[in-house]
Amino acid sequence: TELFGTSVNTSYKFCSPFEVDKKFGSLGSFFNLELTSGMYVANPPFNEKIMTKMSNMLISQLEKKGEEIDIIITIPVWDSVSQKKYNLTDYGMPFQGFEILDTSDFLVEKLFLPKYYAYYSYYADKFISASATHLILLSNYETEKSLDVYKSRWKEVINSDV
């Protein structure tokens, strides 16, 4: 389930803040959703308030007993520690949304994706590098899931002629 999607860019179950998207299968706003057992993907708007609110909500959802929940999150590298670690411009700013996830007991794995790992924009018909990003896997149970499939896929994309 995509936690931040729209009817235009998803074919899976998705959450959207727009009431009209319910006609296309939206589950409604992520912030009103109760997570049940399953895999979720969160690629929120890159807005600090939204990402902090999302991080707090995800942690509270993962604290639920009886549900096996996995969540993959994509957020920008806006935290000073990572900016220094990866030799990026360090703006010296805290990034509470990332810190909540990074210090969580539910953190399974995180992966740094440099800015040159681009995404393909079908609207612009080209690859675009928006920001260096963190790919984070959270889980509330003993899982064997990892980000390995993403690591191997990124290597394929980088080494291709696309």
What are these regions (language model features)?
Residues 1-42, 46-162:
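Class I S-adenosyl-L-methionine
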